[in-house]
């Protein structure tokens, strides 16, 4: 690479995508700078998204577990915790993550520049520092990894003290008794679980006809039932007409004519790429209506020396995938091509209470494709480990080809689902005939474990064959 630039490459953003790219580049001997607009590294994933919401969920789920455990159910020892207490737990996790990630950059001699960056020309960025000064930095190549933020429709007053998005909800100052969540996607469903777990009344407004329609229908139905059973009110096929902030809460007027009132509103319907401040018009790059950039298989934009990874390119918008995209882009940036690529079947983890996780095809997809598949199921309530820990709600479902025994999809609903799924994923990724449901019958599992669900489900499925 040329040394006439300040850096060989500049990475914009220090979230999972930016970190993956920066670490991948510096390990290949590239002179790298990472630009971060906030005081701490980690991006939205660490500070407002994945990490804090999962820390909240964990704290709430442990409270639920304690209160539902028959050992402690004499009603005189019910655990309670305020939202503020649980947020303090999330803050401690964020601080640990930030400290650890800062160490990655320091150990690898990767320079971090703090401030807001925008393109002046195809190789120059203007950096507005926190003290108000502006400096320019140049590089031969760039990786845009600036992430996304919650979508804000113009007719919703997000300055009102009772109207929140998925970022600002982490600064909730009062103890709500009733919350409206608008948008029943992954974020909306996760927060519905958290608030209901804290005994807050929840109205979940879904603009579609079922929850998380990309999931296998049984998993979606299981979540709907679990929400219904815990007291979450789900309203499908609804859209807001007007959102009205009042002194003591929020009134939502729906297009169907209904009205709802609650202490606060969490608006969780869509996200937009953080590209509007990059002055991409100065270099001729265009985004779509959601602020996202188009890239090729090597994560190059329309300008071959500028790459983009993570939420800013859209699907799959997962922290796990963003890190891998960053590593792949780093390899392509240095070598001209990348030997690595994203796996075809990216696992999905949804941190509701209980969790949902899946990898591979759904029953609906396989039916539409006319693939002759069979189903193997294991109910958690029949597993010794689940009985011991009092986690009997849940199921593991394996979809496999009737003739070849190849595993086509795995779907799990229940506590630790996002961990359990990876056992099956490891077998699904095997080549040369290694992907077979018979592996789970022919191997020995520790006992008692949740992993044993795979043996139970495999036997259940194979017994259906004739």
From Swiss-Prot:
Molecular function in Gene Ontology: dihydrolipoyl dehydrogenase (NADH) activity; flavin adenine dinucleotide binding; NAD(P)+ transhydrogenase (Si-specific) activity
Chemical reaction(s) catalysed: NAD(+) + NADPH = NADH + NADP(+)
Record-listed E.C. numbers: 1.6.1.1
Superkingdom, natural source: Bacteria
Biological process terms in GO annotation: 2-oxoglutarate metabolic process; NADP metabolic process
Main location: cytoplasm
Broadest EC class assigned to this enzyme: oxidoreductase
Binding site for FAD: 36-45
Family annotation (Gene3D superfamilies): 3.30.390.30, FAD/NAD(P)-binding domain (3.50.50.60)
Cofactor annotation: FAD
This protein's GO CC annotations: cytosol
Protein family per UniProt: Belongs to the class-I pyridine nucleotide-disulfide oxidoreductase family.
Function noted in UniProt: Conversion of NADPH, generated by peripheral catabolic pathways, to NADH, which can enter the respiratory chain for energy generation.
HAMAP family: SthA
Classification via PANTHER family: DISULFIDE OXIDOREDUCTASE, SOLUBLE PYRIDINE NUCLEOTIDE TRANSHYDROGENASE
Protein name: Soluble pyridine nucleotide transhydrogenase
């Amino acid at each position: 690479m040329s040394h006439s630039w300040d850096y060989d490459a500049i990475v914009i953003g220090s979230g999972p995508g930016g970190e993956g790219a920066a670490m991948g580049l510096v390990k290949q001997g590239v002179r790298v700078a990472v630009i971060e607009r906030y005081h701490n590294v980690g991006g939205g994933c660490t500070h407002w998204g994945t990490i804090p919401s999962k820390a909240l969920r964990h704290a709430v789920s442990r409270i639920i577990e304690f209160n539902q455990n028959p050992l402690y159910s004499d009603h005189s020892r019910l655990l309670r915790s305020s939202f503020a207490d649980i947020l303090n737990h999330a803050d401690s996790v964020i601080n640990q993550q930030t400290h650890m990630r800062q160490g990655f950059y320091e150990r690898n001699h990767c320079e971090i520049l703090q401030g807001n960056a925008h393109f002046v020309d195809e190789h120059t960025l203007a950096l507005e520092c926190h003290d108000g000064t502006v400096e320019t930095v140049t590089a031969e190549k760039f990786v845009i990894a600036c992430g996304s933020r919650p979508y804000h429709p113009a007719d919703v007053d997000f300055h009102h003290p009772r109207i929140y998005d998925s970022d600002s909800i982490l600064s909730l100052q009062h103890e709500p008794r009733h919350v409206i969540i608008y948008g029943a996607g992954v974020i909306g469903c996760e927060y519905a679980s958290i608030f209901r777990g804290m005994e807050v009344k929840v109205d979940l407004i879904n603009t579609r006809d079922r929850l998380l329609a990309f999931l296998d229908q049984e998993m979606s139905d299981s979540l709907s039932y679990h929400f219904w059973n815990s007291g979450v009110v789900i309203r499908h096929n609804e859209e807001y007409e007007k959102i009205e902030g009042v002194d003591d809460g929020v009134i939502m007027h729906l297009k169907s004519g209904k009205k709802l009132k609650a202490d606060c509103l969490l608006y969780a319907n869509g996200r937009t790429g953080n590209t509007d401040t990059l002055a991409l018009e100065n270099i001729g790059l265009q985004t779509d209506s959601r602020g996202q950039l188009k890239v090729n298989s090597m994560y190059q934009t329309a300008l071959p020396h500028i790459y983009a990874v993570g939420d800013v390119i859209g699907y799959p918008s997962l922290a796990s995938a963003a890190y891998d995209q960053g590593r792949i882009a780093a390899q392509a940036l240095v070598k001209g091509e990348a030997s690595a690529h994203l796996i075809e079947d990216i696992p999905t983890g949804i941190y509701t209470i209980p969790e949902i996780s899946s990898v591979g095809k759904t029953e609906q997809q396989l039916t539409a494709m006319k693939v002759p598949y069979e189903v193997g199921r294991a109910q958690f309530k029949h597993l010794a480990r689940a009985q011991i820990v009092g986690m009997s709600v849940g199921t593991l479902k394996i979809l496999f080809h009737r003739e070849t025994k190849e595993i086509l999809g795995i779907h799990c609903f229940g506590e630790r689902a996002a961990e359990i799924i990876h056992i099956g994923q490891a077998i699904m990724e095997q080549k040369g005939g290694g992907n077979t449901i018979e592996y789970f019958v022919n191997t020995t599992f520790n006992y008692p474990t949740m992993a044993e669900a795979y043996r139970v489900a495999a036997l259940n499925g194979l017994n259906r064959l004739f």
